[in-house]
Each structure stands twice: as structure tokens, then as C-alpha cells.
Swiss-Prot record:
Domain notes: The coiled coil domain mediates homodimerization.
Gene: hook
Organism: Drosophila persimilis
Protein name: Protein hook
GO cellular component: centrosome; endosome; microtubule; synapse
One Pfam family cited in the UniProt record for this chain: HOOK_N
Subunit structure, as described in the record: Homodimer. Interacts with microtubules via its N-terminus.
Coiled coil segments of this chain: 135-436, 478-588
UniProt superkingdom: Eukaryota
């Protein structure tokens, strides 16, 4: 299989061996350095493959250094492709380019076959192509068939646009040249045969004339012998007359027959030679006619080649013209687009001119009203300042009103509690006055009732009564704390309202600053923003303090409420026990005397309530009230500051540059965060 595949390579190698080259070119290793191929190309087309180009091919690459061989082969293949494209106008787009690296490293036969195909194409298409074609025709028929197949593959790899006409012309030209060579050889052979037959004919004609002369001589001798009576032989002996039946007659007859046979044979050979000469003349005439036809076909092929060259040039010019036509079409489309854009721009410019005229008229109109607008702006600013002052006064008055309302509510609650206590005391006094006992009996009754009770219960009762008084007084303080808490909550709400108004004002100022010129932004609103930031910090500090104080007060209130409920439950339990004991004492006293018992009970209760009322009530100190109010104000200020800081961070953080954000003051940390740290 490998031999069948490489059959074309060996055929091309046999043809390459016929070239007269200085470098060795007998095998694949000698061809792998590229020197022999370069010499062959220089021999084929010295005007393209010049001596200076041949000098660049290094002959020292025959050794082990395959990189030098690869560089030589690269130069050879590149020059071959340039020759095909520039000189022969071949486009070898479908032909696989030989891999020079595989040739240099491994002496690959397939790649060498492709390289030798390109070299064969150069030899067939060069100026001395007739001599190389005749050398190819002198090879064996198998080699000629393989070489013809290699040329057909090379021709089939040409460009598709040139494929149909050029391949047929090239094949017909090659086949015509090969047939012409065969006919020339046949004509030479026939001419040689004709020359030999003519020589034979001349020899036979000479021999015929000699035989005729000999025959005439023999006939003359025979006639002489017939007329003479005696015949003398060579030895001088008389042979006697020639008579039929004699020995001499028989011998002469035999010689005559032999001569006749030879004459007939010579005449037959002459006729055969004449026929052969005529046949060869007819063949020679047919060959001459065929040669004339082939010469005409070669002339037609050359004319067709010239026409193909003209068509190729016209095709190239047509391609160039088509490219120019495409560019002109694109330019025309761009020109049309530019025309449309120019029309649109003209329309826009006309609209802009009209708008500018209208704007100029409007500017003339508004120039008169500009002074009035500035006056109105100043008046509006004054009115805004007055409105701000009035709103702040209104807020203060609302805050004072709310404080007074809180105090009024606290006083109303205290009044209601006092009225309830008064009603309860009246009921108890009425019950006590029903006894009508004297003070002495009352004293004895009380002493008796106290004597009847154990001392532990008496002490416990006294302690519970004191705690009850303290809790009642603490309840009054608790109401005061609740009032303070309400006041603090109201103040916090007022501060939140002020914070809301301040935030709205900040938003309006920021909106105005965004809509106005950025140069006026820093000059007009910088001071106002700084003032608002300072006010915001103060308010937030106050709000934080008030929040912390309100939370602490709320915790205290809840603790006091829980303690109060627990104490009330204990008081209720002890009161029930006390009433049971008191009823038992009353029953005991009634068992002694019912009148004394009622008097003792009423007098004892009156004294007990007098003692309870005379005890001093604990009051809240002034310092505690001041601390509560200051804590409440701090709480409100801190809350306001936190709210303003958050809104300012939202407003100033978006839509500003890095430098503008760096100029702003960072918001202060809350008091609670500082305390936690």
C-alpha cells in the first residue's frame, strides 16, 4: 500500500534525476536540504530564480542541522508560490502547501511529492518547456502517466474562476505536445524504414541489371555455340556441338532454370517492396496531415492562451472596477444620508432661529419685570423671616399652654382625690358621732380594747397605719411624677414638631440650593446650614437627655406602682384582720356594757384619725424637680439632634461631590453611645 501511495513520488523523482544539476538529487535525503530544488528552479527560470537568490540557499545545510534545511525549504516554497502567483498567474488556494518542517526532520515522501509537483509545474510552464516535455516523453509509459496525473492535480487546484477554461486548455496543450512528439518519432522511424527499403530496392535493381546482363551474355554464348560446330573448352578440348540430351545442354538448361527462379524471386521481392513503399508513403502522408492538424491545434491553443491572459487581465480590471463601484455606492449612500442630515439640521436651525427670536422678545419683556421680581423676593424673604419668628413664638406659646394644661389636669386630679377623701372622712365622722360616749369612757374603752389586744398585733397595726400614711403621701408624689412625665412627653412632642419644621426648612433650602446656581449655593446657604446644624446638635442633645430622664422616670413610676399595689394588698389584708379583731373587742365590750362599748369605739377612732392627720407628709424636694426638668429637656434635644442628623445625612450624602461631603461637619455621637463606651 505504501508503494502504491508513493508511486507518484518515485515517478517525479525519476524525472528529477534526468535534470543536469551539480547538487546530488538521487534520493529523498539529498532533496531534503533544498539545494538541488533551488538549482533546478534556477535552471528553469533564471530571470525569476536569479543567481543572487540561489546564493542565499546555504549548501552547508546537508548535514545534521535540520533547522538550516528548513530555512532553505521555506525560501524555496515561498519563491515557488510567488512565481506561480506573479509570473504564471496561478492561485494555488486548493493546493496543500508542503510542510517544510516534516521534510527537513523526517524526509517525508508525501510532502516531497507536493514540492516536486510544484517544481514540475515550473518546468512545464517555463520558457524551455518544449525540451523538458520531450524529456518527459522519453520516459516509460507508467512514469509518463504518473507525471500526467501530477500535472492534472496541480491544474485542478487552481482557482474556481479560472478552473474550467484553463484546465481544459492546459490539458489539451499538454496532450497535443505529447502526441506531436509521438508522431514525430513515428515519422522518423518510417523515414528510416523508407530509406532502408530504397537502399534494398537499389541493390535489387543493380542485381537485376547484372542478372539481365548475365542472361544476355549467356544467350549470346548459347547462340554462338549453336551456330558453331565445335566448342573448345578451357583446356583446349573440343566439347562438341550443343545438342539436346547432351551433357552440356543439360547443364546449361539447369543454369537457365536457376537464373529464372532467381529472377522471379527478385521480381516478387521488388513488388513487395513497392507495396511497402506505397503503404509507407500513405502512412507518411497521414502522419503529415495529423502533424499539420496538431500544429493548427497548438496555434489555436496559443491564441486561446493569449485570449485567456487577456480575459484574466480584464477579469482583474473588472474586480477592481467592481470594488470601486461598491465604494462609490457606499459613498453615494453616505452622501444621501448627509443630505438628509443637512436638511434636518437646516430645519432645526430655522426652528432655533425662531426660538431665539422669541427668547429675545421674552427677554425684553421680562427685563422690565426683573426689578419688581427682586423687590417681591426681598419682601418674601422678610415675610419668611417674620413667619419663622412668629412660628417659633407660636410653638413656645403652645408649649407653655400645654404645660399649663398639664398642671391644670394635675390640680384637677388632686382636687378630685381630696374631695373623695373628704367624703370618706365625713362618712367616718358621722359613724363615730353616733356613739355619743364621753371622753373618759372612751379612754377606758380604748384602754380596755388595747389591753384586750396582744402587744404584737398592736405594734403591727401601728406600723401598718404609718406605712399606709406614707403610701398615701407617696401616691401624691407619684401623681406629681406622672404629671412631670406627661410634661416631659409634651415637651418631647413639641421638640419633635420643631424638629419637623426645621427639617422641612432644611429640605426647602436644599431644594432651592439644587435649583439655583452652584456658586450661590455655598455663599447663600452655607451660613444657614451651619446654623441649622448647630441648632440641630443642641436640640438632639436636649432630646437625648430628656429621653434618658423620661425612661428613668418611667422605670421609677413602674416600680412605685408595683410597690403600691403590693402594699395596698397587704393593707387590705391587715385591715380585714384589724376589723375582725375590732369586732371581737366590741363584742367583748358589749358583753360588759353596750353603752360603754360604743363610746369607746367612737372616741378611739376620732383620736386615731386626728393622729393620722397630724403626722407630717413627705414632699418632693426642689432639687429633684430641677433634675427631672433638665433630664426631660436633654432627652428632647438629643432626639431632635438625631433626627436632624439623619435627614441631613440623607440629603447631603446624595448628589454631592466628594469634596463637598468632606467640607461638611460630621454629626456628633449620641450621649447614650458615649456613655456606653
Amino acid at each position: 500500500m505504501s508503494a502504491a501511495k508513493n508511486e507518484m513520488y518515485y515517478s517525479l523523482l525519476e524525472w528529477f534525476k534526468t535534470l543536469n544539476l551539480n547538487a546530488p538529487h538521487a534520493d529523498a535525503e539529498s532533496l531534503a536540504d533544498g539545494v538541488a530544488v533551488a538549482q533546478a528552479l534556477n535552471q528553469f527560470a533564471p530571470e525569476s530564480f536569479t543567481d543572487s537568490w540561489l546564493a542565499k540557499i546555504k549548501a552547508s545545510a546537508v548535514g545534521i542541522n535540520w533547522r538550516l534545511r528548513m530555512s532553505n525549504l521555506k525560501k524555496v516554497t515561498q519563491s515557488l508560490y510567488d512565481y506561480y502567483s506573479e509570473v504564471l498567474n496561478y492561485t494555488l488556494s486548493d493546493f496543500v502547501k508542503p510542510d517544510v518542517q516534516r521534510i527537513a526532520e523526517k524526509c517525508d515522501l508525501v510532502e516531497l511529492e507536493r514540492l516536486l509537483q510544484l517544481v514540475l509545474g515550473c518546468a512545464v510552464n517555463c520558457a524551455k518547456k518544449q525540451s523538458y516535455i520531450t524529456e518527459i516523453m522519453c520516459l516509460e509509459e507508467e512514469l509518463q502517466a504518473n507525471i500526467m496525473r501530477a500535472l492534472q492535480e496541480l491544474e485542478s487546484s487552481r482557482n474556481a474562476a479560472e478552473g474550467g477554461i484553463v484546465t481544459s486548455l492546459s490539458r489539451s496543450s499538454i496532450s497535443g505536445m505529447l502526441d506531436g512528439k509521438v508522431l514525430q518519432e513515428e515519422r522518423d522511424a518510417m523515414a528510416q524504414k523508407c530509406f532502408e527499403t530504397e537502399k534494398k530496392m537499389l541493390l535489387l535493381i543493380d542485381e537485376k541489371t547484372n542478372l539481365q546482363q548475365e542472361l544476355q551474355r549467356v544467350q549470346k554464348e548459347f547462340a554462338r555455340l549453336e551456330h558453331s560446330s565445335t566448342v573448345i573448352g578451357d583446356d583446349g578440348v573440343s566439347l562438341g556441338p550443343v545438342q539436346t540430351g547432351s551433357v552440356r545442354y543439360n547443364e546449361l538448361r539447369r543454369q537457365l532454370d536457376l537464373l529464372k527462379e532467381e529472377l522471379l524471386q527478385s521480381e516478387g521481392a521488388r513488388e513487395d517492396l513497392k507495396l511497402k513503399a506505397q503503404q509507407q508513403e500513405t502512412d507518411l502522408w497521414h502522419m503529415q496531415m495529423r502533424i499539420d492538424e496538431l500544429l493548427k491545434s497548438t496555434a489555436e491553443v496559443t491564441t486561446l492562451k493569449d485570449e485567456v491572459d487577456v480575459l484574466r487581465e480584464s477579469n482583474d480590471k473588472l474586480k477592481i472596477c467592481e470594488g470601486q463601484l461598491d465604494t462609490y455606492k457606499k459613498k453615494l449612500e453616505d452622501y444621501n444620508d448627509l443630505k438628509k442630515q443637512v436638511k434636518i439640521l437646516e430645519e432645526r436651525s430655522a426652528d432655533y432661529v425662531q426660538q431665539n427670536a422669541q427668547f429675545e422678545e421674552d427677554a425684553k419683556r421680562y427685563a422690565n419685570t426683573k426689578g419688581q421680581i427682586e423687590l417681591f423676593k426681598k419682601e418674601i424673604q422678610d415675610l419668611h423671616t417674620k413667619l419663622d419668628s412668629e412660628s417659633s413664638k407660636n410653638v413656645k406659646l403652645e408649649f407653655d399652654n400645654k404645660n399649663l394644661e398639664g398642671k391644670n389636669l394635675a390640680l384637677q386630679r388632686a382636687k378630685d382625690s381630696l374631695l373623695k377623701e373628704r367624703d370618706n372622712l365625713r362618712e367616718t365622722v358621722d359613724e363615730l358621732k353616733c356613739g355619743h360616749l364621753s371622753s373618759n369612757s372612751g379612754l377606758t374603752g380604748t384602754t380596755v380594747s388595747r389591753e384586750l389586744q396582744p402587744p404584737a398585733t398592736v405594734e403591727k397595726m401601728q406600723r401598718l397605719e404609718a406605712e399606709n400614711k406614707a403610701l398615701r403621701e407617696g401616691q401624691g408624689g407619684q401623681t406629681a411624677l406622672a404629671q412631670l412625665l406627661d410634661d416631659a412627653n409634651k415637651r418631647c412632642e413639641n421638640l419633635r414638631e420643631q424638629l419637623k419644621t426645621a427639617n422641612e426648612r432644611i429640605l426647602s433650602l436644599s431644594h432651592a440650593s439644587q435649583s439655583d446656581d452652584p456658586i450661590l449655593k455655598e455663599s447663600e446657604f452655607g451660613k444657614q446650614i451651619k446654623q441649622l446644624m448647630e441648632l440641630n446638635e443642641q436640640k438632639t442633645l436636649q432630646l437625648e437627655e430628656s429621653v434618658t430622664q423620661s425612661s428613668s422616670l418611667q422605670c421609677k413610676v413602674t416600680q412605685l406602682e408595683t410597690n403600691l399595689t403590693a402594699r395596698e394588698q397587704e393593707v387590705m389584708a391587715y385591715d380585714a384582720k384589724y376589723r375582725k379583731c375590732l369586732e371581737k373587742a366590741k363584742e367583748v365590750i358589749k358583753s360588759f356594757d353596750p353603752r360603754i362599748a360604743s363610746a369607746i369605739d367612737a372616741s378611739a377612732l376620732e383620736k386615731y384619725f386626728d393622729v393620722v392627720e397630724e403626722e407630717p407628709k413627705p414632699k418632693m424636694s426642689v432639687m429633684e424637680e430641677q433634675l427631672m426638668t433638665s433630664a426631660f429637656y436633654r432627652l428632647g434635644v438629643n432626639a431632635q439632634r438625631d433626627a436632624v442628623d439623619s435627614k441631613l445625612a440623607i440629603l447631603m450624602g446624595s448628589g454631592q461631590t466628594f469634596l463637598a461631603r468632606q467640607r461638611q461637619s460630621a454629626p456628633r455621637k449620641s450621649l447614650s453611645a458615649m456613655k456606653s463606651k
